[in-house]
Swiss-Prot record:
Gene3D superfamilies: Zinc/RING finger domain, C3HC4 (zinc finger). This is RING finger protein PSH1. The modification Phosphothreonine is found at residue 310. Its main location: nucleus. SMART domains: RING (SM00184). Residues 209-406 are annotated as: Disordered. The gene is PSH1. SUPFAM superfamilies: RING/U-box (SSF57850). It is found in: Nucleus. PANTHER family: B-BOX DOMAIN CONTAINING. CDD domains: RING-HC_ScPSH1-like.
Length: 406
């Protein structure tokens, strides 16, 4: 089975063999200078560049972290020589050697020069201009809440201070990875059991930090919410945050106190508003009760009166009743739907007139000596609603109580 590809390749046509060979030669070309990699160097992320191009790339980015030119991943370890690609290119050049071709001679000269440069730098221990010798890493100190420190002098690194120059403030060493960043958590690198242990460890560390800085940590509602949020939070933290996490938790605790004070003030304002509205509504009910009692007193006084109507007045009333009946009939004929009739309107109008008469009688001064004539003067608006006919004045003779005196 180990020689399966060998046998298949031998039986392929020339076109297939040429395509495979062309792809192999393409993998020997540097993506920066687009020339053959006589000294191919492989970065930790797996990309390959020639030694000269990668050396120039590191030298031109002295104020930034060392990163891959293609994927921008941090290069924390020195790139290694890719001997496999180097052997491929050397074998192809050996088979295609042509001493009479000037271009081929130039190609071999370039190959020899680059290989010698690499050998000399390696012997002198000056690979990549000593950039990896003179630089340091930002590492997390697990024994001190994961605080980021310089790998050379172990000085604490503040991301705000090293953000611009990316240099250790103590030993002035170049930090070749981002001091304030956090490695991306790759769940595929761990088994399910290991992932559970990591989640539990992170949850306990988060709870301990929260309990040490939050004054509400002992409350059940806060602790339960923290547990829920910690379980649902994505697995993005690979190292603890150190003192920055503690300062962040302190700010969360202060915000929680301010929010609780604001809620208490809102509740007090709502209670005061409800109390004011309640007093206002109760005053209206008291006024309505007072008006109703006054109206009942007036109506009861009117009920105790006896009204005596003279003959002339009876004749006038009969004539008026006849006219009202005619008017009611005409009114009902024009309303075939039967929803409203003149009789019902008269009864409603009589009730309105009676209440208004009671109100008018309350305002008058009721003083009688013997018998007196009382005129019922209705409002102009009431008469317009009742009947468009001219106003009529009715005379009444009122007897108070059971007295025979007029």
């Amino acid at each position: 089975m180990g020689d399966e590809l060998h046998n298949r390749l031998l039986h392929q046509n020339d076109g297939t063999k040429d395509a495979i060979l062309y792809k192999i030669i393409e993998s020997l070309v540097c993506s920066i200078c687009h020339d053959y990699m006589f000294v191919p160097m492989m970065t930790p992320c797996g990309h390959n560049y020639c030694y000269g191009c990668l050396n120039t790339w590191f030298a031109s980015n002295t104020q930034k972290e060392l990163a891959c030119p293609q994927c921008r991943s941090d290069i924390t370890t020195i790139p290694a020589l890719n001997t496999t690609l180097q052997q491929y290119l050397s074998f192809i050049l050996e088979k295609l050697r042509d001493q009479n071709d000037e271009s081929f001679k130039k190609l071999l000269t370039t190959k020899t020069k680059e290989e010698n440069d690499y050998k000399n730098d390696k012997e002198k221990d000056t690979l990549f201009d000593k950039v990896f010798k003179n630089s340091a890493l930002a590492v997390a100190d697990d024994s001190d809440d994961g605080i980021t420190r310089c790998s050379n002098c172990h000085w604490e690194l503040d991301p705000d201070e090293v953000e611009d120059g990316n240099v250790c403030p103590h030993c002035n060493a170049r930090i070749r990875n981002y001091a304030g960043g956090r490695d991306e958590f790759d769940e595929e690198e761990y088994s399910e059991g290991e992932l559970d242990e990591i989640r539990e460890s992170m949850r306990r560390r988060r709870e301990n930090r929260f309990a040490s800085t939050n004054p509400f940590a002992n409350r059940d509602d806060v602790s339960s919410e923290d547990d829920d949020s910690s379980e649902e939070e994505p697995m993005r933290e690979h190292i603890p945050l150190g003192r920055w996490a503690r300062s962040h938790n302190r700010s969360i605790a202060v915000d929680a106190v301010d929010d609780e004070d604001d809620e208490e003030e809102d509740e007090e304002e709502e209670e005061e508003m409800d109390s004011d509205l309640k007093d206002f509504i109760e005053d209206d009910e008291d006024d309505e009760d007072e008006d109703g009692s006054r109206r009942n007193l007036v109506l009861s006084a009117l009920k105790n009166r006896h009204v005596i109507i003279t003959d002339d007045e009876e004749e006038e009333q009969r004539r008026h009743a006849t006219e009202e009946e005619d008017r009611d009939s005409d009114f009902y004929e024009h309303n075939d739907d039967g929803f409203v009739s003149g009789d019902s309107l008269d009864e409603d109008q009589k009730e309105v007139t009676r209440i208004q008469s009671s109100s008018d009688s309350e305002d008058r001064s009721l003083s009688y000596s013997g018998s007196s004539d009382v005129k019922d003067n209705n409002d102009d608006n009431t008469e317009e609603l009742d009947d468009p006919q001219p106003k009529r004045q009715k005379r009444f003779r009122v007897v108070l109580g059971d007295s025979d005196d007029e």
